[in-house]
């Protein structure tokens, strides 16, 4: 009888252990993944202002139980709140002229612990460039009555200014890449 008790106990224990999840991480919904990406950007980017979700593009298939890599795309915008204030994002309004960042995140659940790599780039630079080109065209029309030599010098310096501006913007507007492990 005593042997029967231990055999039964062993079977129950084996079934209990076998019934637990074999996932190395807890299930992560798409909304939780987006929130995690935004909070990671706010904590690791080195920016002074907090950023809040502007738009998230849900993937066709987000599997919260997946052990493979998952991708997410989102757009965040600068808020009036500072990182040092440690306020809730719901309390923070967007800045009127705040920076808008397009972000792509990759969750690597096959790693132990899981890893998030987030790449964010500023958006909206093309609109500024188009506006500058329109202003230059208007200036050229106004300068048609000037001597040829003056026109050439102005054109040369405009090209030089545009080239320097483009290089400076490119230098300072590099994408931010943030990689973190996710403690579960």
UniProtKB/Swiss-Prot annotation:
Q: Where is the composition biased (Acidic residues)?
A: 125-144
In Swiss-Prot or TrEMBL terms, this protein is called Cathelicidin-related peptide Pt_CRAMP2
What keywords are annotated for this sequence in UniProt?
Answer: Antibiotic, Antimicrobial, Cleavage on pair of basic residues, Disulfide bond, Membrane, Secreted, Signal, Target cell membrane, Target membrane
- Which InterPro entries does the record match to this protein? Cathelicidin-like, Cystatin_sf
Additional facts recorded? The putative mature sequence has been predicted by AMPA, a predictive algorithm for identification of peptide stretches with antimicrobial properties.
This protein's species is Pseudonaja textilis (Eastern brown snake)
Q: Which residues form the propeptide?
A: 23-150
Where are the residues of the annotated region Disordered?
A: 125-147
């Amino acid at each position: 009888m005593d042997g029967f008790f231990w055999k039964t106990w062993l079977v129950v224990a084996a079934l209990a252990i076998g019934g637990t999840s074999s996932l190395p991480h807890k299930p992560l919904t798409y909304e939780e993944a987006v929130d995690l990406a935004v909070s990671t950007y706010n904590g690791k980017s080195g920016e002074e202002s907090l950023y809040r979700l502007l738009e998230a593009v849900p993937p066709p298939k987000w599997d919260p139980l997946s052990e493979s890599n998952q991708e997410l795309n989102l757009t965040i915008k600068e808020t009036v709140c500072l990182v040092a204030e440690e306020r809730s994002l719901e309390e923070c309004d967007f800045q009127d002229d705040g920076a808008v960042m397009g972000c792509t995140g990759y969750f690597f659940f096959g790693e132990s612990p899981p890893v998030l790599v987030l790449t964010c780039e500023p958006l909206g630079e093309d609109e500024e460039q188009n506006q500058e080109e329109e202003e230059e065209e208007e200036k050229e029309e106004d300068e048609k009555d000037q001597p040829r030599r003056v026109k050439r010098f102005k054109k040369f310096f405009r090209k030089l200014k545009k080239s320097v501006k483009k290089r400076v913007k490119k230098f300072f507007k590099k994408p931010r890449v943030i990689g973190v492990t996710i403690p579960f």
